[in-house]
Amino acid sequence: MATLSFRNLKKTYAGNVPVIHGIDMEIKDGEFIVIVGPSGCGKSTLMRMVAGLETVTSGEILIDDKPVNDLEPAERDIAMVFQNYALYPHMSVFENMAYGLKIRKVPKAEIQKRVEEAAQILELGKLLDRRPRQLSGGQRQRVAMGRAIVREPKVFLFDEPLSNLDAKLRVAMRLEILKLHRRLHTTSLYVTHDQVEAMTLAHRMVVMYQGVPEQIGTPMEVFEKPASTFVAGFIGSPPMNLIEVDVAGDGTMTAEGMPLQISPLQVPSAVRGRKIIMGLRPEHMLLNAEGIPVEIEMIETLGSEQLVHGRRGKHMLVVRCTTRQLSESTVKVGDTMNIGPDGRHDLHWFEPDTGRRVQGL
């Protein structure tokens, strides 16, 4: 196990194209960090820099406080699990898992011991003689994980390892990775675009946007207090409703010139008398409540719950409600009705010019 540190880490491609804009971060021994963000945000580039597959333009990467910028990938004592399993088709499961150790000239008895231990952890013991073509997608990914485990690295790197799996297998493999980390306690860096993976796996998550960490925190810290409108719109499914409002000195609000029936008691003094962006989580809103008049444009049926989409001028707002609540309200597409906060959860407030969360709220 090891610590992993980034010190003002930057990456610029040819033509002076910046990709990573200066990351400072300390990852504790045994911590599971998930880097999440949209395509092109720099998360995979950051992972490849740690692995030694991309050069560092400036700054430092340290493992156990030792700079590794100039070390070859094989010298960094890391193991990487990729999106595509990268298994040798002509080798058995045992041979695939053992190959890296053979290259490093580890004694045969030690190889046998490590492979059998990893196979037991990953429930691959009965599959060691099979070829990759005889395995399911989930089994192949477990073999790729086993190949990383037998190296006994200081740091595990996971580069979107579940992206090629179907939805059911992804859930199963998330549980496998959780159990694996609880057993091994190896420092891990995990890259994904899937916020569900980030929320369920991470001790802390790093939300990346345009090469910069927008927010670093525990999953619940990020969900409950997003640092910016980007984070609010990226974390959460469906994402947070964001609406531009004018707040009077007495706490009353208007949006696009129309009054909003939201109690001034829910409006803090820091946002009164100014323009602001107000955020409301779909699951923290109610139909037929005091708040925002909208025209219902769409209703999504998801079994036990429904997503009701209503338009207010240029804003599309979503309410998540149970199927029973929706049937009791008799709402249908084309209706005009009020939606509003449930009163039990805080509203969110963001600066209109920067998108950052209002300080102290």
Curated annotation (Swiss-Prot):
Subcellular location: Cell inner membrane
EC number, UniProt record: 7.6.2.10
Top EC class, one word: translocase
GO molecular function: ABC-type glycerol-3-phosphate transporter activity; ATP binding; ATP hydrolysis activity
Domain ABC transporter: start-end pairs: 4-235
Catalytic reaction annotation: sn-glycerol 3-phosphate(out) + ATP + H2O = sn-glycerol 3-phosphate(in) + ADP + phosphate + H(+)
Gene Ontology cellular-component terms listed: ATP-binding cassette (ABC) transporter complex, substrate-binding subunit-containing
SUPFAM superfamilies: MOP-like, P-loop containing nucleoside triphosphate hydrolases
PROSITE patterns registered for this protein in UniProt: ABC_TRANSPORTER_1, ABC_TRANSPORTER_2, UGPC
Quaternary structure and partners: The complex is composed of two ATP-binding proteins (UgpC), two transmembrane proteins (UgpA and UgpE) and a solute-binding protein (UgpB).
Summary of the function given for this chain in its UniProt record: Part of the ABC transporter complex UgpBAEC involved in sn-glycerol-3-phosphate (G3P) import. Responsible for energy coupling to the transport system.
Family label: Belongs to the ABC transporter superfamily. sn-glycerol-3-phosphate importer (TC 3.A.1.1.3) family.
Protein name per the record: sn-glycerol-3-phosphate import ATP-binding protein UgpC
Species the sequence originates in: Bordetella avium (strain 197N)
Lineage: Bacteria, Pseudomonadati, Pseudomonadota, Betaproteobacteria, Burkholderiales
